[in-house]
Amino acid sequence: IVMKDEVNAFLNTDLQAMLQEAGIKRLVLCGMQTHMCVEAATRAASDLGYEVLVVGDACATRDLKSGDTTVPAAHVHAATLATLDRTYAKVVTVDEALAALE
């Protein structure tokens, strides 16, 4: 378990050292706040050289407000996954992630 206080799970944690020590090269990421924690961890992991799978249907987020505009969670989620896919990660379904781990 890695306790974190930052959006990026690699920032100010031992995560990178733990992964290196274990010889891990591929990460499967999912979680809450697709547009924040999942995105930050995905970008950082990719920048550090990891192969990253983001399990899109195992992530979620919330509506975002900016002034008088509310962006629905589904749009935030889809836009974030589209940004990450094929640039920082491969976005997959739960079934695809499980098959990749076999």
Q: Where would I find each of the regions flagged by the language model?
A:
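Active-site-adjacent betaalpha module
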Residues: 1-102
